[in-house]
């Protein structure tokens, strides 16, 4: 069985946005008991990450690290038509991930105790992002 589901996420600018609950809901609705959930973001300046969900400082530290690694307004970037955060957002998205594959076991995503799925917005302004969930597996 293969099921697809679209997930829309409105961001308020740069940062991480938890989407684990929405993915879990799609898995439950699919009826798949054993399989995989592939998550793909349809954008080049946002990404998907699997990160610790208990301590928000982990995500803040990640943002601080990426800000040092790929600063906004770097004069070496030529692609600046949409502002000083545009090209750095593309680089950050490439350095993180645009897709994740999660195992489904017993009708749920088999995540670790402290794992959560996050949409990581790399632009400084709000955006509407689309994530395609493709669920494949055996129904219960």
Across the structure, where does each feature detected by a protein language model lie?
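Active-site histidine-anchored catalytic micro-motif
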Residues: 1-140
């Amino acid at each position: 069985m293969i099921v697809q589901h679209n997930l829309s996420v409105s961001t308020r600018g740069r940062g991480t946005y938890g989407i684990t609950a929405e993915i879990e809901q799609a898995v439950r609705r699919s009826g798949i008991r054993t399989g995989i959930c592939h998550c793909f973001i349809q954008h080049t300046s946002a990404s998907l990450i699997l990160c610790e969900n208990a301590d928000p400082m982990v995500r803040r530290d990640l943002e601080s690290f990426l800000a040092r690694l790929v600063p906004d307004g770097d004069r070496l970037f030529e692609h600046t038509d949409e502002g000083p955060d545009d090209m750095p957002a593309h680089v950050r998205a490439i350095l993180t991930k645009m897709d994740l594959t999660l195992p489904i076991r017993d009708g749920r995503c088999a995540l670790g105790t402290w794992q959560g799925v996050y949409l990581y917005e790399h632009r400084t302004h709000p955006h509407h992002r689309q994530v395609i969930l493709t669920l494949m597996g055996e129904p219960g």
